[in-house]
UniProtKB/Swiss-Prot annotation:
Keywords: Oxidoreductase. It comes from Corynebacterium glutamicum (strain R). GO terms for biological process: cellular response to oxidative stress; protein modification process. The keyword Oxidoreductase applies. It comes from the Bacteria. The gene is msrA. This is Peptide methionine sulfoxide reductase MsrA. It is an enzyme of class 1 (oxidoreductase). HAMAP family: MsrA. The keyword Oxidoreductase applies. One of its GO terms (cellular component) is cytoplasm. Belongs to the MsrA Met sulfoxide reductase family.
């Protein structure tokens, strides 16, 4: 019996990436179907945001909109090169983007560290360009912030969790941490927004390691 293996995904370069579109794929998003909040603002005074990639964004968005202190979520693409990408383009692996959830939160009710820890516990951050059977650079683990201070706070939580995972026999964490501007986050199509609210029987599993992060709630 012959076995055939797909090649490992490779990150596209800026020169190789698709050129993208001139206009966003979702220019006038409807309010959040669960929270009722505007997807693109205006935000309340004091609200903050972070962009989180843990694999398939459907289940990740649902997980975060259910958390106390989270006041807005949306799904989209970030971390790559192609402006205004479509879902199909992102899935081709030729945009450099990963599937992302934007989380808008009230820092007086929930901390950045708690949001990061919840994400780490909900997926396997050692899998590189995959989560479970979902394979591709668009499924990579990532946290993006608006400033270096928040990125450093994210890194501290991720590094500590990496040491915990090593003690349990896991490999190196491959989570990408970076600073982006809001203009570098591109909303996904309306079909994907709050997908599991619109499609209660939809399927989007988490791939947790089962190892707690240790950040206090």
């Amino acid at each position: 019996m012959a076995w055939f293996f797909a090649p490992e995904p490779v990150m596209v370069t800026a020169d190789e990436a698709l050129k993208g579109g001139r206009h966003p794929v979702l220019e006038n998003p409807a309010p959040h179907t669960v929270l009722g909040t505007p997807v693109t603002g205006p935000w309340k005074e004091g609200q903050q945001r972070i962009w989180i990639g843990l694999g398939c964004f459907w289940g990740v968005e649902q997980m975060y909109w259910q958390m106390d202190g989270v006041e807005g979520t949306s799904v989209g693409y970030a971390g790559g090169f192609t402006p205004n990408p479509t879902y199909r383009e992102v899935c081709s692996g030729r945009t450099g983007h990963t599937e992302i959830v934007e989380v808008v939160y009230d820092p007086s009710k929930i901390s950045l560290e708690q949001l990061v820890a919840r994400g780490l516990e909900a997926h396997d951050p050692t899998q590189g360009f995959r989560q479970g059977n979902d394979v591709g650079t668009q499924y990579r683990s990532a946290y993006y912030t608006e400033n270096e201070e928040d990125a450093a706070r994210v890194k501290a939580v991720v590094d500590a969790y990496g040491e915990t995972l090593k003690q349990h026999g896991f490999g190196e964490i491959t989570t990408e941490i970076g600073v982006i501007s809001p203009s570098e986050y591109f909303l996904a199509e309306d079909y994907h927004q709050q997908y599991l609210d619109k499609n209660p029987d939809g399927y989007c599993p988490h791939h947790s390691t089962g190892i707690p992060c240790g950040v206090e709630a």
